[in-house]
Amino acid sequence: MKTSALFVIFGLVLLFCNSFAAELKTTGRGCGGLMAGCDGKSTFCCSGYNCSPTWKWCVYARPGRR
């Protein structure tokens, strides 16, 4: 019983990871959303976000923020 439950959970996780990878591949976004990695040279943030110089990920653009 425990083994079959583990197989079901493992199968659901595998299905989720596969669908997430397929969705990421089809969107092919050239810019990063919230908390996406960026460096300001080769990877950029979408409009409404700025690349944090400290953490190197996209954060919400706020007035008065660099």
Swiss-Prot record:
Places the protein is found: Secreted
GO molecular function, one term: ion channel inhibitor activity
PROSITE patterns according to UniProt: HWTX_1
Annotated signal peptide: 1-21
Tissue expression per record: Expressed by the venom gland.
Cysteine pairings via disulfide bonds: C31-C46, C38-C51, C45-C58
Major place of residence: secreted
Family: Belongs to the neurotoxin 10 (Hwtx-1) family. 46 (Jztx-7/10/12) subfamily.
Organism of provenance: Chilobrachys guangxiensis
Pfam families: Toxin_12 (PF07740)
Residues modified as Proline amide: P63
KW Signal (keyword) present: yes
UniProt propeptide residues: 22-29
Function noted in UniProt: Probable ion channel inhibitor.
Keyword Secreted: yes
UniProt name for this protein: U1-theraphotoxin-Cg1a 1
SUPFAM superfamilies: omega toxin-like (SSF57059)
GO CC terms of this entry: extracellular region
Domain of life the protein comes from: Eukaryota
